[in-house]
Amino acid sequence: MERAIQGNDAREQAYGERWNGGSGSSTSPFKLPDESPSWTEWRLHNDETISNQDNPLGFKESWGFGKVVFKRYLRYERTETSLHRVLGSWTGDSVNYAASRFLGFDQIGCTYSIRFRGVSVTISGGSRTLQHLSEMAIRSKQELLQLTPVEVESDVSRGCPEGIETFKEESE
């Protein structure tokens, strides 16, 4: 009975934090606070006639442990600096620690999900494979958010990767 009460308290804390956008709580796997756009900001960047369109200001990601789900919306400006910031939104250690609050002797399902530019990736597995699951989630997140050469910050010509001019000179 005591274990069930503790579990319910943890779920209530997770539910409150999920919607209040808090960070740094003892249960959340996320290190950054929720950065969801305001209603006004959302309307400025979206066409109301297209209901399934993502907000171009960032991306959504979530971690689920059994019935408890932690969600975040993070701003992402598609620059190298922004990429490094959002890649640090959680670590394997923070995920393991958060999951340990909900794991018992039985194996439960663990899920990571990310949605960016209309592409959604979900990775799931049992709690006994959590380390492997978080490694796969990190790789998936990096690949999905990977910058194209046009989006890389550069001193040369902002958007043009170094070496382009050299290649053009050689081909002439």
UniProtKB/Swiss-Prot annotation:
<dbReference type="GO" id="GO:0052170">
    <property type="term" value="P:symbiont-mediated suppression of host innate immune response"/>
</dbReference>
<comment type="function">
    <text>Viral suppressor of RNA silencing which binds specifically to silencing RNAs (siRNAs). Acts as a molecular caliper to specifically select siRNAs based on the length of the duplex region of the RNA.</text>
</comment>
<dbReference type="GO" id="GO:0044423">
    <property type="term" value="C:virion component"/>
</dbReference>
<dbReference type="Pfam" id="PF03220">
    <property type="entry name" value="Tombus_P19"/>
</dbReference>
<protein>
    <recommendedName>
        <fullName>RNA silencing suppressor p19</fullName>
    </recommendedName>
</protein>
<feature type="region of interest" description="Disordered">
    <location>
        <begin position="1"/>
        <end position="37"/>
    </location>
</feature>
<feature type="compositionally biased region" description="Basic and acidic residues">
    <location>
        <begin position="1"/>
        <end position="15"/>
    </location>
</feature>
<dbReference type="GO" id="GO:0003723">
    <property type="term" value="F:RNA binding"/>
</dbReference>
<dbReference type="InterPro" id="IPR036131">
    <property type="entry name" value="VP19_sf"/>
</dbReference>
<keyword id="KW-1090">Inhibition of host innate immune response by virus</keyword>
<keyword id="KW-0941">Suppressor of RNA silencing</keyword>
<comment type="similarity">
    <text>Belongs to the tombusvirus protein p19 family.</text>
</comment>
<dbReference type="InterPro" id="IPR004905">
    <property type="entry name" value="Tombusvirus_p19"/>
</dbReference>
<keyword id="KW-0945">Host-virus interaction</keyword>
<keyword id="KW-0899">Viral immunoevasion</keyword>
<keyword id="KW-0694">RNA-binding</keyword>
<comment type="subunit">
    <text>Homodimer.</text>
</comment>
